[in-house]
Amino acid sequence: MGLTQLPEMLLAAANGRGVASVAVIERAGAEPHVYWVPASDSEPAFLAYSITKTFTAALILKLCEEGQLSLDYRLARWFPHITHADRISLRQLLNHTGGIPDYGGIRAYHEDLKSSPSIPWSFERFAAETFDKGLWFEPGQGWAYSNPGYMLLKRVAEEVTGVSYRALISERIARPLGLRRTFVAESIKDLAELAPGTSSALSPDGAPRDVRAHYHPGWVSHGVVASTASELVRLLDSLFGGELLSPHSLAQMTELVVLPTDPSEASLEQDASSRRGKPSYGLGLMGDPVSPWGLAVGHNGGGPCYSASAFHAFDLGSASVCAMGAIEEGFSAEDVVFDVLDHLAASGNSRAAQQGIATDGASPRS
């Protein structure tokens, strides 16, 4: 059992409910194997949601390498009015230890999303509902997942460069790595070429609505990347292959903070799987130093309609795996990724390589 199982695994996970894809780079520098369902002429694209945080972290680290920023810079340089901004570092924003509140549990956010999905909150509204009210804990004295923390990082990158976040991601990451279908979505029109799908989170009565026609990406406060599974595995493979950042920056990016064990203290975007040994977080990276596949890092993303998961397993031949779907219920991108990693571990990457499995550039036959 190895990569030959990918089509069957994806078909089972999607179960005819919508569009889904999976891509695998089985060893560092290899070409990706990619499959998608249902059959179509081109690989589908999706919103990657919080996988965007990995892009933001890489961008901030690149600006640090250029001398425009330092991870030790304090937030007070740009936002002096935020509580304890003089004690919150960019590093703490990146690893969610700065105490910046999130909006995931705020009723008004979900109510406004349902009633006005095409009119997102402004930066000022996100701020007013979260960090303008104070911090969740003293900087450096806890951990809590924070989308507004990454919204602040996005604004910092734009302030120091004078360039929009969309252009920065294109110029500093996507273009150098040849990611031609990866971009920051900023309008409803930007969703037109994505995989079709619906969401019940976009209407007051819970009726499913076409995400591409109604959902404004601005509801993701920190920005949201649209991409394909094959391009996201290329991102991870290139990132950890040293094509984007220096060894020093990568070491900082993968320095992990172990998450609180009490589920009431912290939560990730998807429930922790039993295959997680020690859930941790680096700089824009979810991670586990003692997973069944050794050190594994990456990120999950989820929101209306779309879900995504992409992880890199250093001790498994530096394999990278990404799954994405336009299926709101009953599909777990993370489970697909973990299943693929299990199969790679069981079959052995060296054996898979010797079998010479060819890259499938089209959707599997059904």
List PLM regions with ranges.
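Catalytic loop of the DD-peptidase/beta-lactamase superfamily, centered on the K-T-G motif
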Residues: M1-Y35, E43-L47, E158-V163, A167-S170, ...
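Active-site-proximal loop and beta-strand segments within enzyme catalytic domains
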Residues: G16-S21, S40-Y145, V163, S203-P204
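Catalytic-site signature segments of enzymes, centered on catalytic residues
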Residues: H33-W36, S42-A45, G105-R107, L113-L191, ...
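Alpha-helical structural context
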Residues: W78, T97, E159-V160, P176, ...
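Secretory-pathway/luminal and periplasmic proteins that interact with or process carbohydrate-rich
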Residues: I82-S89, G99-I106, P176-E186, V258-E265
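Generic alpha-helical structural context detector
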Residues: R91-N95, A128, R175, R234-D237, ...
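Mobile, glycine-enriched helix-loop/loop "lid" segments at the mouths of ligand-binding/catalytic clefts
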Residues: I188-P208
